[in-house]
């Protein structure tokens, strides 16, 4: 009889813990029906199949056709990068945060519930930052001198413990976006007012890929670089790393607009997402053969 009672108590305790865990998860993410403004990064973070948008007021998530927002850590996220375990970010603390301003480089491996300082907390807000999806190597543009770095381009291959200055020779124009290959950190791409650039030596030198077009977005998967540019209209191109072939891809109808963020679902390589200058977001489930709009002028659908 005693043994049976102990089993019942154990089962009830287990159900209570599971219930608390489920409740905590639901409390952290709630349904969202508003506007997604001031987006400074987008991607599929960790093993979560949700598409994360880093905004002025925390994280907004599109998952299984539903929009969600987080209820804590409502920070002004900048330089957001999704990785295989979660995300890395920079920016400024929200009203509910006790983080110093700016927040330096932070990372989260639990969907944004908690943040861990990587480097430069209270010193620098990094807008131009790329993090390898698998390697977690960091490539960034430091906007001004801090306690360790001068102004310029740097990379870290040990999670921010040490930094190496890189030359970025040939890279011209005002920087809009950076991307680093998921696992091969010799490959770095940049989008600037002068075009889209590719480096094959870890950022020491860059070569121009575009002709008379402004670069707007860059994104790597293992095999390819996807980049967006704008001349008389928007363009989305797949650049195959192995042979340098370039393929023009289908974009939705965009009037005086173009992609500023590109993402691919690592759990479903047919699924891509883009976010545009005017606050439109589109999802493709067939490798960019067609697009479904999920944000209209920043308003969720």
Question: Where do the model's predicted regions map?
Answer:
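Repeated scaffold domains used in trafficking and secretory/extracellular systems
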Residues: 39-43, 75-84, 123-131, 173-180, ...
């Amino acid at each position: 009889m005693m043994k049976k009672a102990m089993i019942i108590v154990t089962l009830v305790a287990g159900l209570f813990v599971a219930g608390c865990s489920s409740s905590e998860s639901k409390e952290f993410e709630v349904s969202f029906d508003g506007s997604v403004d001031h987006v400074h990064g987008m991607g599929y973070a960790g093993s979560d199949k949700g598409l994360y948008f880093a905004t002025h007021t925390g994280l907004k998530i599109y998952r299984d056709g539903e929009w969600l927002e987080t209820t804590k850590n409502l920070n002004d996220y900048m330089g957001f990068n999704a990785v295989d375990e979660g995300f890395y970010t920079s920016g400024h603390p929200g009203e509910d945060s006790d983080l110093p301003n700016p927040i330096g480089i932070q990372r989260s491996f639990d969907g944004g519930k908690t943040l861990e300082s990587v480097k430069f907390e209270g010193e620098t807000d990094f807008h131009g930052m790329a993090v390898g999806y698998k390697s977690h190597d960091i490539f960034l543009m430091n906007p001004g001198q801090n306690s360790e770095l001068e102004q310029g381009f740097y990379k870290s291959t040990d999670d921010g413990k040490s930094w190496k200055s890189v030359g970025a020779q040939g890279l011209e124009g005002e920087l809009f976006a950076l991307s680093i290959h998921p696992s091969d950190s010799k490959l770095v791409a940049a989008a600037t007012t002068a075009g889209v650039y590719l480096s094959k030596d870890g950022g020491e030198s860059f070569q121009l890929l575009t002709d008379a077009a402004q670069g707007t977005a860059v994104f790597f998967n293992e095999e390819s670089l996807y980049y967006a540019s704008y001349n008389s209209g928007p363009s989305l191109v797949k650049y195959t790393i192995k042979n340098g072939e370039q393929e023009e891809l289908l974009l939705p109808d965009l009037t005086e607009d173009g992609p500023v963020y590109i993402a691919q679902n690592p759990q479903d390589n047919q699924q891509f997402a883009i976010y545009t200058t005017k606050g439109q977001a589109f999802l493709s489930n067939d490798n960019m053969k067609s697009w479904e709009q999920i944000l209209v002028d920043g308003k969720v659908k």
